[in-house]
A protein has these predicted regions:
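Predominantly a core beta-strand signature of beta-propeller blades
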Residues: 48-53, 99-103, 145-146, 188-192, ...
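Short loop/turn segments that connect beta-strands within beta-propeller blades
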Residues: 44-48, 95-99, 140-144, 183-186
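Non-catalytic accessory segments flanking enzyme active sites
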Residues: 1-3, 9-27, 127, 146-228
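Short, ordered coil/turn segments that flank beta-strands lining enzyme active or ligand-binding pockets
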Residues: 16, 46-47, 69, 97, ...
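Short coil/turn segments that connect the beta-strands within blades of beta-propeller domains
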Residues: 17-19, 70-72, 120-122, 163
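A flexible loop/linker signature enriched in serine peptidases of the S9 family
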Residues: 1-8, 24-41, 53-63, 72, ...
Length: 228
């Protein structure tokens, strides 16, 4: 832990009571090289009990565990197709007491790369790819309703504390710029407070070209997006 070669701190999370942690683990074996079957294991903090596989029923990838603030729910991301590492991650909620799981937003076709619960556990804040960008979204845990909070670029990382979010956002014209804002007043990036300068502000003598997004119909009548 973390998993190789691309694992990180989001591969594991501590339970709020500090007595255990949950980690995304792929058990070594003959098929480990091509398998995508990562499971979530509950691990006793004192090592007095054997690890328990919480997601044995899913033969695909389970990742990114995080507890609700009260410890009653374990949120995580899960793929459904074994061996297909480009599968969509679904947002999942597991009742810690019963082990029952459900998909939070089954109608949402985006694949979140990170998630963090709100202070009361009623919502998840996630970053997910969306037509060439990585916006920040709010997902209602009860209804699955999805709201885009920050667009116009890619949110590479974020942290939520109470009503405040701090995030790093980049675009084709600039590397990461740090912003903060209130979660109650965000809307497509409005009301963000810029903390660090953009590339243009750092390099006033450099001309950064403009860009725009375009789309066209591709194979299977699918919409293909690009930049020019």
């Amino acid at each position: 832990i973390p998993s190789k070669p691309f694992g990180g701190a989001d591969d594991y999370t501590w339970a709020p009571d500090g007595r255990s942690l949950v980690a995304s683990v792929k058990v070594a074996g003959r098929e480990a090289t091509w398998s995508t079957n990562f499971d979530l294991y509950r691990i006793d903090a004192l090592g007095e009990a054997a690890p328990v596989n919480l997601t044995a029923a899913n033969p695909a990838w389970d990742a990114g565990p995080v507890f609700s603030p009260d410890g009653s729910t374990l949120f995580y991301r899960a793929m459904k197709r074994p061996g297909f590492e480009a599968d969509r991650y679904a947002l999942m909620a597991m009742d810690v007491a019963s082990g029952q799981t459900r998909e939070i937003a089954p109608r949402w076709d985006r694949s979140p790369s990170s998630l963090q619960p709100s202070a009361d556990g009623s919502a998840l804040y996630v970053a997910a790819q969306d037509t060439g960008e990585y916006p920040l979204f709010r997902v209602d845990v009860a209804t699955g309703d999805v709201t885009k909070l920050v667009a116009d670029g890619s949110v590479s990382s974020f942290a939520v504390a109470g009503d405040t979010v701090a995030l790093a956002r980049n675009s084709i014209r600039s590397g990461d710029v740090i912003y903060t804002g209130s979660l109650q007043s965000l809307g497509d990036g409005a009301n963000l407070r810029q903390i660090t300068p953009t590339a243009a502000e750092r390099l006033p003598d450099v001309a950064f070209g403009d860009f725009e997004q375009f789309s066209f119909k591709g194979a299977g009548n699918e919409t293909v997006h690009g930049y020019v």
